[in-house]
Curated annotation (Swiss-Prot):
Reaction(s) catalysed by this chain's protein: a plastoquinone + NADH + (n+1) H(+)(in) = a plastoquinol + NAD(+) + n H(+)(out); a plastoquinone + NADPH + (n+1) H(+)(in) = a plastoquinol + NADP(+) + n H(+)(out)
An individual GO BP term: photosynthesis, light reaction
Family: Belongs to the complex I 30 kDa subunit family.
Lineage: Eukaryota, Viridiplantae, Streptophyta, Embryophyta, Tracheophyta
Gene designation: ndhJ
Classification via Gene3D superfamilies: NADH:ubiquinone oxidoreductase, 30kDa subunit
Protein name per Swiss-Prot or TrEMBL: NAD(P)H-quinone oxidoreductase subunit J, chloroplastic
Source domain of life: Eukaryota
One term of GO molecular function: quinone binding
Location(s), subcellular: Plastid, Chloroplast thylakoid membrane
NCBIfam families: PRK12494.1 (NF009141)
Amino acid sequence: MQGHLSVWLVKHGLVHRSLGFDYQGIETLQIKPEDWHSIAVILYVYGYNYLRSQCAYDVAPGGLLASVYHLTRIEYGVDQPEEVCIKVFAPRSNPRIPSVFWVWKSADFQERESYDMLGISYDNHPRLKRILMPESWIGWPLRKDYIAPNFYEIQDAH
C-alpha cells in the first residue's frame, strides 16, 4: 500500500520503493543511494525541513547496511506534523551513501556515528571521521560480523 508521499513521488517521476507503514503509521520508503541526495533536496523543498534522527544498522551478517532517516514536516500551527522514514541500503563491500549534511545540518554527528560504528561512508560530508572510537580503532563495532579484539589480559591472582 502506498502512502501520501509515495504517491506524490510517483506523480513527479521520482524513483523509490514503498515499504509500507511502521507501527505508528509513519510511511517508510526505500531510496537507492544514487538517488538519495536529489530526493533529499526535493523532500526539503517539499517541506520536510527537520531531520529528527539518522541511524544505521547491519541488515544481516555479510548482507547490506542500512542508513535510516526520520524526517518531519514542521509547519506553523500544525499539531501533528507529517513524518516519513527513509531507508537507504548500501552493499557492505563498498558502503557509500551521499551525505545530507548540506540539506539538514543535524546530520553531522549522526552520519559520523554511523560511519564510526558501521563503516558507511557518507560522500561529501565535511568532517567524516570517527566520533566515538579512537582514530586508531580497526573495524566497525556494530557490524554483525565484527570480531572484538581481546582487550583483557588474565591477571595473576597473587
